[in-house]
Amino acid sequence: MSFAGQAAWITGASSGIGAALARALAAQGARLILSGRNTAALEDVAKDCGEALVLPFETTDIAAIAPAVEQAWNWSGGIDLLVNNAGISQRSLAVDTAYEVYERIVAVDLLAPIALTQALLPRMVARGSGRIAMISSIAGKVGVPMRTAYCAAKFGIAGYADALRAEVGHLGLQVHNIYPGSVATDVSRNALTADGSKRGVSDQTIDNGIPPAIAVAQMIDEMLAGSREIIVAEGAEK
């Protein structure tokens, strides 16, 4: 089994897990819709992806979602796989963290993927097929210090996906919860600190983490196998 000939829409596709996933799916023959905020970086990824549409937009801009869905659907003839990957992490103690940081992380990591899924869902239901993948985190299963906002959002998106699966599974749709552990990306470098500024330095555990290409290979294999929960972490291999 593979994603050959299928249309996959990935948010946060300009780097890290999103970019690696795009390249891996393209290698299987999938057609890609690549979304994010950095158009130049998306175009660089698209060069490796064969048939690809670069569709930049801000996922928290609710007004931009409906036009993006329309464009993606019309270009592809129907989305077979939506990967809600765009996100932002946190590195700060709760006692020090501004409320605005909670608002920002919940907006990006929870409300934005819900909004995009809700906009696309009626089309998938009407067609009677499709996959929706939520990139949560190990921090969406276990409370991790210095990440209270991030944990809240990632637990939340996992709960949304679990409930959604119960609603649409009998309609031909599959919903996957993906829980990456330490994958070697810029996630910790781009994390927000207590005042909302970018951290700018990486965690050693992240730097020494699973290479993105290996992580996404597992994700793809387990999605094709129909796994509901996909844990991508050292020692979690099946």
Predicted feature residues:
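Conserved glycine-rich Rossmann-like NAD(P)H-binding loop of the short-chain dehydrogenase/reductase
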Residues: 28-44
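Substrate-binding pocket helix/loop in short-chain dehydrogenase/reductase
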Residues: 93-94, 98-103
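The beta1-alpha1 cofactor-binding region of Rossmann-like NAD(H)/NADP(H)-dependent oxidoreductases
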Residues: 57-67, 99
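Residue(s) in the substrate-gating loop at a strand-loop-helix junction
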Residues: 137
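SDR active-site lid
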Residues: 166-233
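Active-site helix of classical SDR
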Residues: 117, 153
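Conserved glycine-rich cofactor-binding loop
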Residues: 7, 14-15
